[in-house]
A protein has these predicted regions:
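N-terminal membrane topogenic signal
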Residues: 3-16, 157-160
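Juxtamembrane helix-break-helix junctions at the cytosolic face
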Residues: 90-106
Length: 163
């Protein structure tokens, strides 16, 4: 597209895309119980899905029970996922600087890229400590692997603006 041939437009589009994805990813942590109420019948034990992926279905059942019982007995546990969402939104807002002045705020983009890379060792260390199955850890790591792509492309375009 002609519009994205301008490096400044490309940088802004990539960063806004990243910011929206980051914010939506975080916001999905708030209605966790509601989301699991929808997922369990579709993908939990007894669903058609469970015939092909029984381990994932069993995990969905376990997470559903954990959230339902945990939030039921200790509703303050949900406060942790509320803060997780807040953290995602706060980090997304930090990218307003690079959207406005990409060259001056290149460091924010590079910081975001570092965080995307750090998702992988963080997951590999803490996932097993918390009993998280490997397939779920792959999902968690994918956020860093996917998130780094628009940031890397934005960084390349910012460097084009500098030169």
């Amino acid at each position: 597209m002609k519009m994205f041939s301008d490096p400044m437009v490309r940088v802004r589009a990539l960063l806004i895309f990243f910011m929206i994805g980051l914010a939506l990813s975080g916001l999905s942590a708030v209605p966790l119980q509601w989301e699991l109420d929808i997922l369990k019948p579709l993908f939990g034990s007894g669903s058609q899905f469970s015939r092909f992926f029984p381990a994932i279905s069993s995990w969905i059942d376990q997470v559903y029970q954990g959230v339902k019982n945990g939030y039921g007995l200790y509703p303050f546990l949900a406060y942790g996922t509320d803060w997780l969402a807040f953290g995602h939104i706060a980090i997304a807002l930090a990218f307003i600087g690079p959207v406005r002045e990409p060259i001056k705020n290149l460091w924010v983009v590079e910081f975001g890229m570092i965080i995307c890379v750090l998702v992988i060792p963080w997951t590999l260390v803490f996932g097993p400590l918390r009993g998280i199955p490997f397939f779920h850890m792959l999902l968690d790591m994918s956020f860093g692997m996917v998130g780094i792509i628009p940031l890397w492309l934005a960084r390349r375009s910012i460097l084009d603006l500098i030169s």
